[in-house]
Amino acid sequence: MLKKFLAKLGKGAAKVDLQFENRPYGINEVVQGEVILKGGQVDQQINKLAVKLMMTVSSKNGQSVSRQVDEIPLTGPFLISKQEERHIPFHYSIPSTLPLSRNFVSYYFDTHLDIEGGFDRTDIDHVIIAGSREIHSIFNAFSQLGFREKATSGKLDTYGQEFEFFPTQLFADQINELEIRFAYMGTGIKIWLEVDCRSNYGEIEAKREFVLSKELLENEDQLVDFLRDSIAETVQQPQLYGQPFSYHVQQPGHSGIGSGIGSMVGGLAVGILGAVLLDEIMDSFDMDEIFEDAEEAIDTDDDDSDFFGMDFDDFSGGDD
């Protein structure tokens, strides 16, 4: 009787442990593993066993919120005997429209063992969601062109996820910042490219969008050449590329996700968090950028020889 009473309080109760290979997982990739159940000091009735994928979005000011992305049911009701051990297979395919893990976007699996008449048991396991092989190829190509990802890259909005880069080599005297978005298309990867070009009259925003074919994505040298030529063409005549992006035209008022633009990376975020909550969290980034831009302008006026007018410690990215 005492053991049953203690088990209801959690002492000597059944335990749960999700195990899978600890590495980054690309979108559309399958996480495979198993859940190990170990019976406690007494027989216990289990109502269900399920694993939830949770997403946490944080802001610079420390505000954060976690929401359920998906739930993977593993069992219905069953009885686990005293000291019994069970191994239950687990697999989950990462959705293509999830935001990628970045400084302010993270994920974890919450394994939940629902014990009848007692304290439920949980197991938390963090997981990194990375880009697909094709997106890795694009990131690597930008890296070869001297672009480094900013610390605030990966911000979310009601369309999806935006990745921000700054130049360190080839285009350092022509570009302030480069921003990109991705979407999976049947023929390859669609990319939206916004280039903040330097000019004698201030900054000019140029917008380009094109589809990188599967064949191009498989050839690293050709991909680098294509992106280099596209960026060079853009900075030479930025005034020719002032039209709004197609997803702005197709989705007036930011009212929907995925209409006519394929599967934009990060597009699932607004459905998980809600547009209002997402906007509130991301507002802190917008204010930080306003102050950073003001500081950059002041520093540039004080010292024209210092191109960026900012501390590179504010950024993080790939290896130089």
Explain the meaning of each model-derived region:
Residues S263, G267, G271-L278:
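Hydrophobic alpha-helical membrane-embedded or membrane-associated segments
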Residues M1-P99, N103, Y108-S263, D279-D320:
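N-terminal leader-region detector that preferentially activates on the first domain or presequence
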